[in-house]
């Protein structure tokens, strides 16, 4: 009988969490519009040093409005080139410097950039538990009010290329794990951290916009986004195949023009779109 009672308690507890999560599945919008956010801690988790580019206008706006923006990159980006002259070590350092230059143009401090150092292109094959534990540690340290990440998908697994796909699910799994005291409890008992539940999420994608429910007007921050994007010399334009740390003015202007063309327009405004979610991490994909 005692076993039965315990089993019923466990089932009831699981049902309660599921019921709460289910109640939060409907489409949402933030209580306060994104352009009015202030005093928040923002954490973006991405796979590569340019993944945040899709949100650069929003991130620049949030930093300018008195929020603290942090960028966490899982890999060093040490594979993403077609230039045979570059080694992994060289490319990793190039991409780090490009990211720091981009963040400077956005107004985000350099010490708000975190790189976990995993190899580019192989994120899916890393020790998943170790990666999630590392992410949980940073979530518990920074205690973000909002997490930006690749969209893991709503009601289905969203297609991304490998590292983006891995980053989407690693971020979601870490958000869930961070709230449970007995998961990675050494961080709490030995490192002085505390469990933490992220209350709000902003998920993004590069081409699939069907699940978006929030569009941020970045018209006043387009120049910052374009200038920041132009620092990714090794990734965009001719630098991907033939890296030159000092591109010509014509090449820089071409990169800026491409960056501007990539920014979407909605109702006459330059925008960035997101799938906003607020609630328990268990229902992120619902």
PLM features per residue range, with description:
Residues 3-6, 23-45, 129-286:
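Metal-dependent de-N-acetylase/amidase catalytic core
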Residues 8-11, 101, 231:
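A periodicity- and composition-biased signal for non-globular, repetitive helical segments
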Residues 4-10, 60-63:
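Hydrophobic transmembrane signal anchors and adjacent membrane-proximal interface regions, especially
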Residues 18, 104-107, 230:
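Charged, amphipathic alpha-helical interaction segments
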Residues 23-142, 283:
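Active-site rim/loop-helix segments in enzyme catalytic domains that contact anionic ligands
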Residues 7-19:
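Bacterial N-terminal signal peptides
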């Amino acid at each position: 009988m005692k076993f039965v009672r315990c089993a019923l308690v466990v089932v009831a507890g699981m049902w309660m969490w599921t019921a709460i999560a289910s109640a939060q599945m409907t489409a949402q919008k933030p209580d306060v519009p994104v352009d009015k956010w202030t005093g928040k801690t923002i954490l973006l988790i991405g796979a590569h040093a340019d993944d945040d580019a899709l949100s650069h206008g929003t991130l620049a706006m949030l930093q300018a409005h008195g929020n603290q923006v942090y960028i966490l990159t899982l890999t060093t980006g040490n594979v993403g080139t077609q230039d045979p002259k570059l080694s992994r070590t060289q490319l990793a350092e190039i991409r780090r410097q490009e990211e720091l230059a981009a963040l400077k143009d956005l107004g985000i401090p350099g010490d708000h950039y975190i790189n976990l150092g995993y190899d580019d292109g192989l994120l899916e094959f890393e020790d998943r538990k170790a990666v999630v534990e590392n992410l949980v540690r940073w979530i518990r340290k920074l205690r973000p009010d909002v997490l930006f990440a690749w969209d893991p998908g709503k009601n289905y697994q969203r297609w991304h290329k490998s590292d983006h796909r891995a980053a989407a699910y690693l971020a979601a799994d870490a958000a869930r794990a961070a709230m449970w005291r007995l998961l990675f409890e050494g961080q709490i008992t030995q490192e002085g951290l505390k469990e933490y539940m992220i209350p709000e999420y902003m998920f993004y994608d590069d081409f699939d916009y069907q699940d978006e429910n929030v569009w941020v007007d970045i018209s006043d921050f387009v120049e910052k986004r374009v200038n920041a994007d132009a620092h990714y010399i090794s990734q965009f334009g001719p630098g991907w195949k033939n890296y030159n740390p000092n591109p010509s003015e014509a090449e820089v202007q071409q990169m800026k023009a491409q960056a501007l063309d990539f920014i979407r327009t909605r109702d006459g405004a330059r925008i960035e779109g997101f799938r906003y979610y607020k609630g328990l991490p268990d229902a992120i994909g619902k």
